[in-house]
Design a protein with these regions (language model features):
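Two-component histidine phosphotransfer core
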Residues: 118-119
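Short, intrinsically disordered, charge-balanced linker/junction segments flanking boundaries
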Residues: 125-131
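A detector for short, charged/polar N-terminal pre-domain segments
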Residues: 8-14
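N-terminal core-binding DNA-recognition domain of tyrosine recombinases/integrases
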Residues: 2-6, 17-32, 38-115, 130
Length: 131
């Protein structure tokens, strides 16, 4: 998926640690959500290879989204990965690590809407007879 031999520089490691603190203290994320978001960001930064996460622009983020959509992820997983990236860049912008937020227009894939399940007339009658 990505080159795991490429090491993140110390600054990016610090961004991730600060981001995890932000998610814990200010967003009150659960440990599970925190771990998922951190993993998503590490994967993204490793995918960037030698480019700093602070230099990525909207086109680079879209390129990453096209990359992850080639895998057999559920739409909910892709939506979470996008949410992770959007939250990360919002954090970087808020902390003034970047001058503009390239993820502000990034949108998640639409989740399919399903129709509600309904009772058959026989099931309704059976319920009414048992009351």
């Amino acid at each position: 998926m990505y080159n795991t031999q490429v090491a993140m520089d110390n600054q990016e490691k610090q961004y991730i640690e600060d981001f995890k603190t932000y998610l814990t203290v200010e967003k009150n994320f659960s440990e599970h959500t925190l771990a998922a978001y951190a993993s998503d960001i590490v994967s993204f930064i490793l995918w960037l290879d030698n480019m700093s996460c602070t230099k990525a622009d909207f086109d680079k983020l879209r390129e990453y989204l096209h990359f992850i959509q080639r895998f057999d992820y559920k739409k909910t997983t892709i939506a979470r990965k996008i949410a992770s990236i959007r939250t990360f860049y919002k954090f970087l912008y808020r902390e003034r690590y970047i001058d503009s937020n390239p993820a502000i227009s990034l949108s998640a894939p639409k989740r399919p809407k399903s129709l509600p399940k309904f009772l058959t007339p026989e099931e309704v009658e059976q319920i009414l007879n048992n009351v």
